[in-house]
């Protein structure tokens, strides 16, 4: 990344901003303080208010009109072109009248529905509805035949029983008391409308009125649909174009200039300088100055990884985005995490299940069904933790992880704890000491690799003390690990003939400690035990594998004993234990290796070189769905 400054005549401000937007490779920043003092804020755009007014109007159009597919992309050559097209669509009066009428009809239909809900309980009775309301009393339906009528005795109310409800009539000044008592016993009240006629006749009349209102509503919606057929595609295109223009106007606040010139600064990828320079020179007719800005500012972070690796950027961003000058560890995470995960699962049955679940999640997110058969409680809980796209990314990351688990499970001959293959390459219990040793070597390798990356990074940043500190920790870690391994394999000796590796290890420790003290001083001595713990922490790769295998085998053992017990009850219980026990262990096989695998990378590895706390590179651009880049390099906007 490098910071650039563009200085050009004020008359080219709009085409320059359009060019930068359509290129989409520059994060525009506030001007540096030393330059800012020499310049004034940029003039406000003369068209700003017009753009915002039209944008508000067209957003309203798009929200009100029925949705229609947008099959084409529009190309606008200038802001004037956009405003000209926007001025041709003036359907304010049509939409306002239609919406007001629609709201009135909806309110009337709601009122009719409310009246019908009360009258439904009176259907079939031969009395006039008007007898239940007067100047000094009101009546209500209690739609519950099991309600305790005695609770209303203090109201001196008239109560008339119906088939499935009661009618209660009270004095007008007792309606609040009625509501209070009804709330206290959990009874619902429905006010009887002030109407005349027998219930069946009134119901028929109200249904006729509702049918007429429904017909009027359909006519309004048809009218809105006709407007949508005619204008929706163009409205969506103009709305998107106006949003882009509004974004360009907003960025003008970061510009500085004089009466005749303006200046803009920002970050671009280093390999985009030529592209930006060519485009700006073209729109200004070579009447501009484009230069790089030397600065000690930390640049924003642009992550660039192959498509299949980029999905693991999710995990890096979750932890902390690397600084702009830092090494991007996404590739390392993408290679190491699946291996750690698969080794800790170590069962090809669980690996196959995780693979199928991952594929199901990806398909489900891409093709959501009209009606889900997954319990709503589970789906809500999952979506509360992660968005659908995050869930899809996690599922994609688990595909290579599950494949490694399948391979490891085939080697260990583990299928949900059963040894169903006719061969076993490595029996987990038989090779346990070797697995522990391999995990230790993996830990040493990861820690050493982390310090090497930190050493290179400090040298790149010309931090000599930091580089010496990393080198000291590297020597100390290798020295301690060498002595520890020699303790396991051989007697600890320091003779030249039999213990040369120990002498080298001690020398590395002796050299490493002063190098650590150069930067960290006494704090370094406190941190030394943590290096040993970081290396040993990788033994959890084997620990979690053994735990998973043991739990699966215990579940299988209980199941097998129940089957041979000659008891139907025990056999059924054994099947239940097998199913739910394996489901529980499968959940553990997803979460525990996932959490611990990520932790080994985040804590034990990243801490050796990674700073994080970077800021995302956010170039000045927009995602276009309905429009094309409209920049004409020969004309101003």
Curated annotation (Swiss-Prot):
Location in or out of the cell: Cell membrane
Protein keywords: Cell membrane, Hydrogen ion transport, Ion transport, Membrane, Transmembrane, Transmembrane helix, Transport
One term under GO cellular component: proton-transporting V-type ATPase, V0 domain
Transmembrane spans: 342-362, 403-423, 436-456, 471-491, 498-518, 541-561, 568-588
Keyword Phosphoprotein: no
Membrane-related topology note: Multi-pass membrane protein
Presence of the UniProt keyword Transferase in the record: no
Protein name: A-type ATP synthase subunit I
Organism: Thermoplasma acidophilum (strain ATCC 25905 / DSM 1728 / JCM 9062 / NBRC 15155 / AMRC-C165)
């Amino acid at each position: 990344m490098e910071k650039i400054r563009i200085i050009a005549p004020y008359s080219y401000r709009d085409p320059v901003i359009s060019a930068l937007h359509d290129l989409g490779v520059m994060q525009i920043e506030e001007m540096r303080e030393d330059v800012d003092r020499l310049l004034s804020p940029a003039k406000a755009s003369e068209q700003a208010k017009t753009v915002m007014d039209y944008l508000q109007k067209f957003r309203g159009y798009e929200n009100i009109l029925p949705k229609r597919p947008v099959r084409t992309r529009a190309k606008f050559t200038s802001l004037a072109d956009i405003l000209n097209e926007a001025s041709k669509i003036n359907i304010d009066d049509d939409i306002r009248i239609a919406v007001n009428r629609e709201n009135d009809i909806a309110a009337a239909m709601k009122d009719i529905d409310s009246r019908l809900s009360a009258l439904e309980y009176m259907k079939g009775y031969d009395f006039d509805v008007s007898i239940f309301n007067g100047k000094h009393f009101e009546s209500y339906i209690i739609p519950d035949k099991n309600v305790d009528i005695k609770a209303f005795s203090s109201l001196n109310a008239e109560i008339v029983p119906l088939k499935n409800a009661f009618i209660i009539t009270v004095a007008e000044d007792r309606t609040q008391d009625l509501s209070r008592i009804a709330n206290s016993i959990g009874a619902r009240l429905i006010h009887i409308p002030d109407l005349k006629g027998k219930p069946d006749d009134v119901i028929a009349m109200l249904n006729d009125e509702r049918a007429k209102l429904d017909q009027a509503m359909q006519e309004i919606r048809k009218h809105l649909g006709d407007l949508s057929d005619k204008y929706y595609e163009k409205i969506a295109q103009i709305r998107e174009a106006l949003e882009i223009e509004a974004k360009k106007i907003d960025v003008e606040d970061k510009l500085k200039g004089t009466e005749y010139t303006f200046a803009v600064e920002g970050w671009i990828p280093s390999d985009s300088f030529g592209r930006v320079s060519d485009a700006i020179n073209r729109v200004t007719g070579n009447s501009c100055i484009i230069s790089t800005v030397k600065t000690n500012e930390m640049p924003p972070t642009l992550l660039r990884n192959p498509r299949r690796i980029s999905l693991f950027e999710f995990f890096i961003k979750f932890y902390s985005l690397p600084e702009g000058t830092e090494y991007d560890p996404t590739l390392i995470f993408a290679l190491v995490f699946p291996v750690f995960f698969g080794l800790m699962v170590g069962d090809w049955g669980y690996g196959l299940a995780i693979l199928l679940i991952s594929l199901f999640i990806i398909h489900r997110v891409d093709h959501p069904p009209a009606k889900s058969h997954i319990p709503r409680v589970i789906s809500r809980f999952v979506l509360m933790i992660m968005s659908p796209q995050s869930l899809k990314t996690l599922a994609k990351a688990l595909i290579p992880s599950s494949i490694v688990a399948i391979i490891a499970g085939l080697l260990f001959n583990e299928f949900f704890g059963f040894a169903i293959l006719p061969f076993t390459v490595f029996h987990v219990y038989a090779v346990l000491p070797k697995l522990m040793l391999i995990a230790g070597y993996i830990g040493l390798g990861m820690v050493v690799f982390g310090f090497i990356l930190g050493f290179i990074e400090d040298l790149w940043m010309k931090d000599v003390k930091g580089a010496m500190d990393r080198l000291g920790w590297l020597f100390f870690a290798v020295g301690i690990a060498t002595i520890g391994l020699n303790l396991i394999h051989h007697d600890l000796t320091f003779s030249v003939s039999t213990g040369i590796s120990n002498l080298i290890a001690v020398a590395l420790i002796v050299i490493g400690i002063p190098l650590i003290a150069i930067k960290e001083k006494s704090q370094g001595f406190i941190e030394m035990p943590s290096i040993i713990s970081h290396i040993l922490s990788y033994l959890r790769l084997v620990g979690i594998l053994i735990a998973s295998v043991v739990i699966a085998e215990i579940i299988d053992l209980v199941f097998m004993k129940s089957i041979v017990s000659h008891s139907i009850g025990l056999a059924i219980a054994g099947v239940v234990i097998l199913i739910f026990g394996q489901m529980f262990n499968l959940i553990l096989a997803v979460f525990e290796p996932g959490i611990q695998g990520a932790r080994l990378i985040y804590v034990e590895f990243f801490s050796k070189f990674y700073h994080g706390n970077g800021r995302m590179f956010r170039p000045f651009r927009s995602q276009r769905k309905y429009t094309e880049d409209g920049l004409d390099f020969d004309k101003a906007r």
